[in-house]
Amino acid sequence: MLCYVTRPDAVLMEVEVEAKANGEDCLNQVCRRLGIIEVDYFGLQFTGSKGESLWLNLRNRISQQMDGLAPYRLKLRVKFFVEPHLILQEQTRHIFFLHIKESLLAGHLQCSPEQAVELSALLAQTKFGDYNQNTAQYSYEDLCEKELSSSTLNSIVAKHKELEGISQASAEYQVLQIVSAMENYGIEWHAVRDSEGQKLLIGVGPEGISICKEDFSPINRIAYPVVQMATQSGKNVYLTVTKESGNSIVLLFKMISTRAASGLYRAITETHAFYRCDTVTSAVMMQYSRDLKGHLASLFLNENINLGKKYVFDIKRTSKEVYDHARRALYNAGVVDLVSRSDQSPPSSPLKSSDSSMSCSSCEGLSCQQTRVLQEKLRKLKEAMLCMACCEEEINSTFCPCGHTVCCESCAAQLQSCPVCRSRVEHVQHVYLPTHTSLLNLTVI
């Protein structure tokens, strides 16, 4: 079965999968060809029969979700946006940048005039390199998609000149840094109508749910802690919210189709799980529905039969779990230099690099590769001794009666259930581990 997958830069990829393949099979093949290990940040989108943008459920068959016959047309998109310094791979960062660039040019991200000037210069640097008087004005107008005033153009030119020697990768990273500070970063928008038929936009993001008018002017913002429940029935999505008075109110959102309503319901549940939870619960992972054939088979044959089973959600890991999983995968693959980009100075232009940078006087007899391996082992050792909740203080408390020792005293006192086995905590016992870092005298080479 053939699938055409379009990247954010409009490059088309042909992907051949089995006729009964799930969406995950297609996404994994795309990411493998792009050299991306951080697959969990991405998803595949397609357009429904009524023009709505829908996420392919990666755990279900492709052919059962798409209209018509193969070849199917899909779009590779970032589903979960994270801070730039949490992205470990250059390839992943590049796809993030392409998606952000597409959103900027389409006007989906609102930025201030100062940010627009800086972003225009950075986008020109990523596409054309250092400032060139012969192509500068054309470049800026092409990127901004509008006529520029002379004062704005001069400001962009000045900014672009300051970027001389900055590599494409560094410029892309700076774009991500600027955009990640914007209010609407990482928000997925859905077109809805309220109970009175008024057109609205619902934004589902890391911090909560935004309700806006069609011009993105805000009406209300709902934080996740006050959301009691989200449910879907047909084309409608119901959101039960706790008011400041303590009473509950049910908000109704009407969608253009049942699949669009399912998409909003999925977005609320999966986004909350990804950004706000320690792990994806089994209640989310195992929620499914059955078609008629599968329902009959479960009644008369076996309740656990997979026939006709369609999973509601496809999220597998939270943001923290994705980061940890990617670090382990990259380390096992031999990629050990995973220092955060925020801790490095921006890489210079390849034309200005020097061959002398290959030698290092601080390694004291060890090769740079050996030094990096030891530094990574040391980092993992220190990290293993940190509280899994705050990742700042050292582990010094045991949960009873389960016996898991994974948190510091302050975090353990706030937990009612063990974050590892989910069993109820009756009391917390302070412990003195012989692996305290001060006793080990750990220092970086």
From Swiss-Prot:
Keywords: Cell membrane, Cytoplasm, Iron, Membrane, Metal-binding, Transferase, Ubl conjugation, Ubl conjugation pathway, Zinc, Zinc-finger. GO terms for biological process: cellular response to low-density lipoprotein particle stimulus; cholesterol homeostasis; negative regulation of low-density lipoprotein particle clearance; negative regulation of neuron projection development; nervous system development; positive regulation of protein catabolic process; protein destabilization; protein ubiquitination. Residues 342-363 have a biased composition (Low complexity). GO terms for cellular component: cytoplasm; cytoskeleton; plasma membrane. Homodimer. Interacts with the E2 ubiquitin-conjugating enzyme, UBE2D1 (via RING-type zinc finger). Interacts with myosin regulatory light chain (MRLC) and TMEM4. The RING domain mediates ubiquitination and the neurite outgrowth inhibitory activity. The FERM domain binds phospholipids and mediates lipoprotein receptors recognition at the plasma membrane through their cytoplasmic tails. This is E3 ubiquitin-protein ligase MYLIP. The lineage of its organism: Eukaryota, Metazoa, Chordata, Craniata, Vertebrata. The gene is Mylip.
